[in-house]
């Protein structure tokens, strides 16, 4: 009998990936996180290229999770709380499409859940401006350079600009 859990992936962009990754790493049921880039047109982009805003990529975090321990809906709830989804192509002082608010879905079920979640958030009264989060199909995920992986954890805390 195979006891290995069936793991799933979720991918979120919510500004600087250092902060986003640190938040999701705290969640029980999250097995792994990876900082990287998605949503652009250049293969194997570097951090410098993504920051140039000429590759179309967003800084994202790929979240590998056990759905028996944490639901995708719970990950979405966390996503909405860790950034301001009303800021277009920025989070705080970090400006550019690479810092956009985006949910990349991996399955039709994730797409439906993301859209319902965004509709619920939009009607929650929490925001004075409309939500501008993009919801898009997951494309190639490119790992960020090693020094970006678990960046805040490795450096004993700190934060991004947001």
From Swiss-Prot:
GO terms for cellular component: cytoplasm. It holds the Pfam family PMSR. GO terms for molecular function: L-methionine-(S)-S-oxide reductase activity; peptide-methionine (S)-S-oxide reductase activity. It catalyses: L-methionyl-[protein] + [thioredoxin]-disulfide + H2O = L-methionyl-(S)-S-oxide-[protein] + [thioredoxin]-dithiol; [thioredoxin]-disulfide + L-methionine + H2O = L-methionine (S)-S-oxide + [thioredoxin]-dithiol. Keywords: Oxidoreductase. SUPFAM superfamilies: Peptide methionine sulfoxide reductase. This is Peptide methionine sulfoxide reductase MsrA. It comes from Geobacter metallireducens (strain ATCC 53774 / DSM 7210 / GS-15). The gene is msrA.
